[in-house]
Design a protein with these regions (language model features):
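Aromatic side chains
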Residues: 6, 34-36, 89
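Extracytosolic low-complexity repeat regions of secreted or lipid-anchored proteins
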Residues: 106-165
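Compositionally biased, intrinsically disordered low-complexity segments
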Residues: 12, 86, 134, 153, ...
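N-terminal segment immediately downstream of the Sec signal-peptide cleavage site
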Residues: 25-79, 161-183
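N-terminal export signals
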Residues: 5-24
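Predominantly extracellular/secreted and cell-surface proteins with exposed
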Residues: 49-132
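Intrinsically disordered, low-complexity, compositionally biased regions/tails
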Residues: 16, 68-70, 89-91, 96, ...
Length: 183
């Protein structure tokens, strides 16, 4: 065997031996993604918050955003319920991300991030957004309800996940450990 053939075979063997480690290396470099559509109930009244969002989380920041409608759900009011505010939101500083387990490419856990809300009227304000994802069918629960918690200190408003009778949440959240990027 010639020296060049030996080196080629040796390099190929090293590459093949490294393949099992590749998914772990690739996974360590990817961000966790989040997606949700949820309804929150005001902790001190009949207001509701419909909110959607998606994005990614890296060790320093949450990147993403979505849309929201804040409305008065007083049963005495006719449909359509009056909208109190509507607009978009943008994720900001990461407070914490705790992944408690995975099931395939899905993950359960709790994401806490700072966010900026922008109203169509031009008003903007800060909030803390907590996205809580449980994967009950995988036996993974954070101990908190599925959904999104929003605290808006400037207005003294707090929203918690709303539920159907029986405790099933109005909305879904999901984290993923896989992010496809075109190109």
């Amino acid at each position: 065997m010639k020296r060049r053939e030996f080196l080629t075979i040796g390099a190929g063997s090293i590459a093949v031996a490294a393949l099992p480690a590749m998914p772990a290396l690739a996974k360590a470099k990817t961000d966790t993604s989040f997606n949700f559509l949820t309804i929150g109930a005001h902790t001190g009244g009949t207001d509701m918050l419909v909110m959607s969002g998606d994005g990614t989380v890296n060790p320093a920041r949450a990147i993403g955003g979505g849309s929201w409608n804040h409305f008065d759900n007083d049963p005495a009011l006719p449909v359509p319920k009056p909208i109190l505010g509507t607009g978009t939101w943008t994720a900001g500083d990461l407070v914490s991300l705790e992944i408690i387990g995975t099931w395939g490419v899905l993950a359960a856990g709790k994401l806490v991030m700072e966010a900026r809300f922008f109203e169509e009227s031009g008003l903007h304000f800060s909030a803390t957004v907590t996205v809580n994802c449980n994967l009950g069918f995988a036996g993974l629960s954070t101990g908190l309800p599925e959904g999104v918690f929003v605290d808006i200190p400037d207005f003294g408003l707090s929203f918690v996940p709303a539920t159907f009778p029986g405790g099933f949440p109005f909305g879904l959240t999901v984290f993923s450990t896989v992010n496809e990027r075109p190109g």
